[in-house]
Amino acid sequence: MTTLLIAEHDNASIKDSTNKALTAAAALGGEVHVLVAGENAKAAADAAAKLAGVKKVLLADNAAYAHDLAEPLAALIVALAPSYDAFVAPATSRFKNVMPRVAALLDVMQVSEIIKVVSPDTFERPIYAGNAIQTVKSKDAKKVITVRTSTFAAAGEGGNAAVENAASAADPGLSSFVGEEVAKSDRPELTSARIIVSGGRAMQSRENFAKYIEPLADKLGAAVGASRAAVDAGYAPNDWQVGQTGKVVAPELYVAIGISGAIQHLAGMKDSKVIVAINKDEDAPIFQVADYGLVADLYQVVPELTEAIGKLGK
């Protein structure tokens, strides 16, 4: 069995989600090859070649893959399909757009967000917002799989794979890049952060996020997250959303402030190693999954907590 892992990268380096998806790909057995598709992405390909367990790296370096458009990348993967038995990618927003297209073009079923490889054709995945585990056995000759990376350990370095150039596939021409607005931040990326501080609808405004949540996050060196209710209310940007319809995270420490704990939010963070909840409602569902809970007014205790942590750092 030969598996093609599609790498998530920034052209210069490999994202941590790729390292974790590699662990899942290796569990299928057989060789694992990595596809790096981008523009001026040689550095990312070289980084992928150093990952333990990678047999070969395919580099598709073309302007068509510069802006994460789903159609050209899906066409490339399908063009490579005759040589592979399985196609694996992290279950990130990018590949949630790409991999269903690959599955449709190959006329197979996609197995989404697996959390365990039972055998090369059998997988476990969460359903019902993580409240049940489904075992899926795929009879398709070619497997298309996305990986919930929060449940897999990251593969380390130690490899020395060859890097080969892959011919670009014909662009379907179904979409074109218009532009992008990039939000830059000195904080860690949400899905790979060790610590996350999240705010909910109780924050009441974008200004309160900036006044209470962000200073605490900065003191802890943390990423900032938000519940869907807070995002829908306009208190936080979409890329901060944690939950079933947002980003799934599993940091070492997750601090939930003013978050009631809707089932959709819990599905995105309940695998965190330590969960701390601050909420004035003692019956809030968030306390059912929290390791530590504080029933208090966030507007009083969060500034005190931020100040106390600041003093510890001096």
Task: Cite the ranges covered by each PLM segment.
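N-terminal glycine-rich FAD/FM-binding segment characteristic of electron-transfer flavoproteins
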Residues: 1-314
